[in-house]
């Protein structure tokens, strides 16, 4: 332990007033029991992997994430408390690069919190609950506590929160401990969205002094409880107005509070970390001392944190791979592997021994981690084997690059070439450079990456200053307005009003002919890209004339607003009434493919293939389906045979027919459906309805929660053809499937190959392995055709 830390620890031991010790299990229990006594509903933590429809988050990073629907739309009054698993390792809240350097930053942490939705309890009750729990239940000395409140921002018309100040006085906090702050005590969800003043409780780790001047300045005085009064909303123009309802959102970092009640200056000295650090010390044959001045101790903290975070993420379904949250999990694992071996001397393939320790530490509160620890450990070993294979091969190339120049800076372009050509991740290159006293030009690396990356135009088009509250009359329910009559679909041409026009990413009054821009309609019939389903396309009409070509549509502002992108064919302006005309052929093809996606998921589960869907992308009469293979160890032949059976099962289901049933119900009712394929996400709690889609009739049919558009009769899918199944990395595979007209086209092509190969007239036989387009041949026919080709020879 460093000199500064020793002094702080000694002072704490001299002046600490806590009368008893709390293990992490005891602290959790006391929190739940206290808020249960205050008539709160106790909820389990939701997954650290957010709902797939929430494209704004890589991981659940705050206790309030799961309550977004309740905050934005529900009128239900509720008192709720929980301890939420969180990971901050990407995006706005990113602690990844700070871990190890101090005694408190973590990527995985738990957030204690209680909430009042729609005035379930008052501002004063929230403050009293917090004070009572800290002082009377945990026994924290009130003389160590300071409170801060919002001091007001005059130019924004936000007054000082004097009500809050008076509440703390009534509770018994002396005036010199009630401190006004501005930015520190105004909470915002983002640039636009819910916001409001907050009050915070701060704890002086040393005590026996006036530490009021150190609040929000010195690390010896730490914030332990934040109470947010969510009463306002900031629109896309920066204007703040009343939300129309009052919510209270409170949060306490679990590990930080644990360090307080266990008399520790460091989160890493609490009993959620000490077993992991002790095992790491055993593997490294080195002692962890808790010093801030030791690079070795910083590595201990990094390894303990990253292994813990990756273990939790994998237990919740994350798969280390090259995209999204899987990329961050892989990055954490590989950083722990590299630093654990290179700096602590841990042997290769020993890091997975930390997984059972993490699982055992958290067994009581998160049994799912313990139950899947064997599977998690296998993933660790597989990932480490793949990592060292890459590093050993690419390290020689790095050594060559490093030897080319004596400069202390390694070119970012050369680092990018190592990544692009040899698969050496930037993080590994940076660590290798540090080991020889060099740095990598990461700015140049990023520039090279952006140059090489073909950024999808669609992905970047929809960055508009739009908030969910900007268009209260907007709705996209008309996307479900279609009927199946006399063997075909009918889509009404819905008339509506243009609410807003955007040009060059900014609000505009109008678009001239040939201008490209964005539109928000009042009652939008176009399906906005969401949940893997591609968007509708089509036209807007006035008096029968096409005035705007819709090229794309996407849901933004947290999925609350559907925005159309396209080209004006004639001048149009805001407030015009227009008629919507979908590309019906495209919509029908997408509906067939989306329903077939559910059918494939069902068939795979029935045959025991894989361990669950990881993602999908649905287009017109074709889709891709990503699934986890879990611990499967199948040969190519075995997997192909299973997929052939899967296709047969799907085709049989389609031939038998049956109508689609779609209902909207509450979360609680949806969770009671026994054969529901998709998990009902805990972050969509009661108050928000879910849409349940059942294909066909009977007990054994595909049933999923889904917001997509679907066919009304299973027979309309016509046919399905599984075209390919390939590996996308460790334990992840991708299936490509065609439906409807696309499936029929590949069947006709395959039929022509069979006719050619079976012809008795040599002049009519023209097919060889080289001139067959195998991408147009279903997987079920590829092996048979290969046999016929061999017989032909």
UniProtKB/Swiss-Prot annotation:
<feature type="binding site">
    <location>
        <position position="594"/>
    </location>
    <ligand>
        <name>Zn(2+)</name>
    </ligand>
</feature>
<dbReference type="Pfam" id="PF01411">
    <property type="entry name" value="tRNA-synt_2c"/>
</dbReference>
<feature type="binding site">
    <location>
        <position position="706"/>
    </location>
    <ligand>
        <name>Zn(2+)</name>
    </ligand>
</feature>
<dbReference type="InterPro" id="IPR050058">
    <property type="entry name" value="Ala-tRNA_ligase"/>
</dbReference>
<feature type="binding site">
    <location>
        <position position="598"/>
    </location>
    <ligand>
        <name>Zn(2+)</name>
    </ligand>
</feature>
<feature type="binding site">
    <location>
        <position position="187"/>
    </location>
    <ligand>
        <name>ATP</name>
    </ligand>
</feature>
<dbReference type="GO" id="GO:0006419">
    <property type="term" value="P:alanyl-tRNA aminoacylation"/>
</dbReference>
<keyword id="KW-0862">Zinc</keyword>
<keyword id="KW-0479">Metal-binding</keyword>
<feature type="binding site">
    <location>
        <position position="253"/>
    </location>
    <ligand>
        <name>ATP</name>
    </ligand>
</feature>
<comment type="subunit">
    <text>Monomer.</text>
</comment>
<dbReference type="GO" id="GO:0004813">
    <property type="term" value="F:alanine-tRNA ligase activity"/>
</dbReference>
<comment type="function">
    <text>Catalyzes the attachment of alanine to tRNA(Ala) in a two-step reaction: alanine is first activated by ATP to form Ala-AMP and then transferred to the acceptor end of tRNA(Ala). Also edits incorrectly charged tRNA(Ala) via its editing domain.</text>
</comment>
<feature type="binding site">
    <location>
        <begin position="224"/>
        <end position="226"/>
    </location>
    <ligand>
        <name>ATP</name>
    </ligand>
</feature>
<dbReference type="InterPro" id="IPR018163">
    <property type="entry name" value="Thr/Ala-tRNA-synth_IIc_edit"/>
</dbReference>
<dbReference type="GO" id="GO:0000049">
    <property type="term" value="F:tRNA binding"/>
</dbReference>
<dbReference type="InterPro" id="IPR023033">
    <property type="entry name" value="Ala_tRNA_ligase_euk/bac"/>
</dbReference>
<dbReference type="GO" id="GO:0008270">
    <property type="term" value="F:zinc ion binding"/>
</dbReference>
<dbReference type="InterPro" id="IPR012947">
    <property type="entry name" value="tRNA_SAD"/>
</dbReference>
<protein>
    <recommendedName>
        <fullName>Alanine--tRNA ligase, mitochondrial</fullName>
        <ecNumber>6.1.1.7</ecNumber>
    </recommendedName>
</protein>
<dbReference type="InterPro" id="IPR018165">
    <property type="entry name" value="Ala-tRNA-synth_IIc_core"/>
</dbReference>
<keyword id="KW-0496">Mitochondrion</keyword>
<keyword id="KW-0694">RNA-binding</keyword>
<dbReference type="InterPro" id="IPR018162">
    <property type="entry name" value="Ala-tRNA-ligase_IIc_anticod-bd"/>
</dbReference>
<comment type="similarity">
    <text>Belongs to the class-II aminoacyl-tRNA synthetase family.</text>
</comment>
<dbReference type="GO" id="GO:0005739">
    <property type="term" value="C:mitochondrion"/>
</dbReference>
<dbReference type="GO" id="GO:0005524">
    <property type="term" value="F:ATP binding"/>
</dbReference>
<feature type="binding site">
    <location>
        <position position="88"/>
    </location>
    <ligand>
        <name>ATP</name>
    </ligand>
</feature>
<feature type="binding site">
    <location>
        <position position="249"/>
    </location>
    <ligand>
        <name>L-alanine</name>
    </ligand>
</feature>
<keyword id="KW-0067">ATP-binding</keyword>
<keyword id="KW-0820">tRNA-binding</keyword>
<dbReference type="InterPro" id="IPR009000">
    <property type="entry name" value="Transl_B-barrel_sf"/>
</dbReference>
<keyword id="KW-0809">Transit peptide</keyword>
<feature type="binding site">
    <location>
        <position position="710"/>
    </location>
    <ligand>
        <name>Zn(2+)</name>
    </ligand>
</feature>
<dbReference type="GO" id="GO:0002161">
    <property type="term" value="F:aminoacyl-tRNA deacylase activity"/>
</dbReference>
<keyword id="KW-0547">Nucleotide-binding</keyword>
<dbReference type="InterPro" id="IPR018164">
    <property type="entry name" value="Ala-tRNA-synth_IIc_N"/>
</dbReference>
<dbReference type="InterPro" id="IPR002318">
    <property type="entry name" value="Ala-tRNA-lgiase_IIc"/>
</dbReference>
<keyword id="KW-0436">Ligase</keyword>
<keyword id="KW-0030">Aminoacyl-tRNA synthetase</keyword>
<dbReference type="InterPro" id="IPR045864">
    <property type="entry name" value="aa-tRNA-synth_II/BPL/LPL"/>
</dbReference>
<dbReference type="Pfam" id="PF07973">
    <property type="entry name" value="tRNA_SAD"/>
</dbReference>
């Amino acid at each position: 332990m460093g000199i500064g830390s020793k002094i702080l620890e000694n002072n704490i031991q001299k002046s600490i007033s806590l009368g008893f010790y709390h293990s992490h299990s005891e602290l959790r229990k006391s929190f739940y029991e206290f808020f249960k006594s205050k008539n709160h509903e106790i909820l389990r933590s939701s997954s650290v992997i957010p709902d797939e429809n929430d494209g704004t988050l890589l991981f659940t990073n705050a206790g309030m994430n799961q309550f977004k629907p309740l905050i934005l739309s529900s009128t239900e009054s509720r008192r709720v408390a929980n301890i939420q698993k969180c990971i901050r390792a990407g995006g706005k809240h990113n602690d990844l690069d700070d871990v190890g350097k101090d005694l408190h930053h973590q990527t995985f942490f738990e957030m204690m919190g209680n909430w009042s939705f729609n005035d379930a309890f008052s501002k004063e009750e929230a403050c009293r609950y917090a004070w009572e729990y800290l002082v009377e239940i945990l026994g924290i000395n009130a003389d160590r506590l300071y409170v801060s409140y919002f001091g007001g921002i005059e130019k924004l018309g936000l007054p000082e929160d004097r009500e809050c100040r008076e509440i703390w006085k009534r509770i018994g906090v002396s005036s010199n401990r009630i401190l006004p702050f501005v930015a520190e005590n105004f909470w915002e969800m983002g640039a636009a969205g819910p916001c409001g003043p907050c009050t915070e409780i701060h704890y002086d780790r040393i005590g026996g002094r006036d530490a009021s001047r150190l609040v929000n300045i010195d690390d010896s005085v730490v914030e332990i409880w934040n109470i947010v009064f969510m009463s306002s909303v900031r629109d896309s123009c920066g204007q703040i107005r009343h939300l129309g309802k009052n919510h209270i959102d409170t949060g306490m970092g679990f590990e930080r509070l644990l360090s307080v009640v266990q008399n520790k200056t460091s989160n890493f000295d609490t009993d959620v970390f000490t077993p992991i650090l002790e095992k790491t010390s055993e593997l490294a044959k080195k002692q962890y001392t808790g010093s801030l001045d030791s690079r070795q101790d910083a590595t201990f903290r990094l390894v303990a944190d990253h292994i813990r975070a990756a273990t939790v993420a994998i237990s919740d379904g994350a798969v280390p791979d090259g995209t999204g949250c899987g990329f961050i999990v892989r990055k954490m694992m590989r950083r722990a592997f590299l630093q654990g071996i290179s700096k602590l001397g841990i042997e290769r393939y020993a890091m997975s021994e930390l997984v059972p320790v993490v699982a055992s530490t958290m067994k009581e509160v998160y049994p799912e981690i313990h139950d899947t620890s064997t599977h998690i450990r296998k993933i660790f070993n597989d990932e480490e084997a793949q990592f060292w294979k890459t590093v050993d091969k690419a390290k020689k190339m790095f050594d060559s690059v490093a030897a080319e120049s004596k400069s202390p800076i390694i070119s970012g372009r050369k680092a990018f070439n190592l990544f692009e050509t040899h698969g050496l991740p930037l993080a590994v290159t940076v660590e290798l450079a540090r080991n020889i006293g060099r740095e990598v030009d990461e700015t140049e690396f990023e520039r090279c990456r952006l140059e090489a990356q073909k950024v999808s135009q669609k992905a970047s088009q929809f960055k508009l200053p739009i908030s969910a509250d900007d268009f209260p009359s907007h709705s996209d329910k008309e996307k479900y307005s279609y009927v199946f009559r006399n063997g075909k679909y009918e889509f009404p041409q819905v008339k509506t009003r243009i609410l807003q026009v955007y040009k060059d990413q900014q609000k505009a009054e109008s678009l001239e002919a040939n201008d490209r821009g964005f539109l928000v309609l009042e009652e939008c019939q176009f399906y906005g890209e969401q949940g893997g389903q591609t968007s509708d396309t089509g036209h807007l009409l006035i008096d029968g004339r096409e005035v705007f070509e819709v090229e794309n549509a996407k849901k933004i502002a947290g999925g609350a607003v559907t925005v159309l992108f396209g080209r004006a064919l004639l001048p149009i302006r805001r407030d015009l009434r227009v008629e919507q005309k979908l590309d019906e052929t495209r919509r029908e093809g997408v509906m067939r493919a989306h329903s077939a996606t559910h059918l494939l998921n069902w068939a795979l589960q029935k045959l025991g293939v894989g361990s669950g869907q990881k993602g999908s992308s649905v287009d017109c009469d074709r889709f891709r389906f990503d699934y986890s293979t879990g611990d499967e160890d199948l040969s190519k032949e075995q997997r192909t045979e299973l997929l052939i059976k899967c296709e047969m099962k799907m085709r049989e289901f389609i031939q038998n027919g049956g109508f689609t049933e779609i209902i909207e119900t509450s979360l609680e009712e949806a969770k009671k459906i026994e054969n529901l394929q998709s998990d009902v996400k805990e972050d969509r709690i009661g108050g928000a309805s879910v849409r349940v889609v059942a294909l066909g009739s009977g007990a054994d049919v595909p049933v999923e929660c889904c917001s997509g558009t679907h066919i009304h009769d299973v027979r309309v899918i016509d046919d399905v053809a599984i075209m390919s199944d390939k590996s996308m990395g460790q334990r992840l595979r991708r299936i490509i499937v065609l439906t409807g007209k696309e499936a029929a086209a590949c069947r006709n092509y395959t039929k022509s190959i069979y006719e050619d190969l079976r012809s008795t007239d040599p002049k009519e036989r023209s097919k060889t392995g080289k001139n067959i387009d195998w991408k147009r041949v279903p997987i079920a026919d590829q092996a048979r055709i290969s046999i016929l080709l061999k017989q032909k020879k």
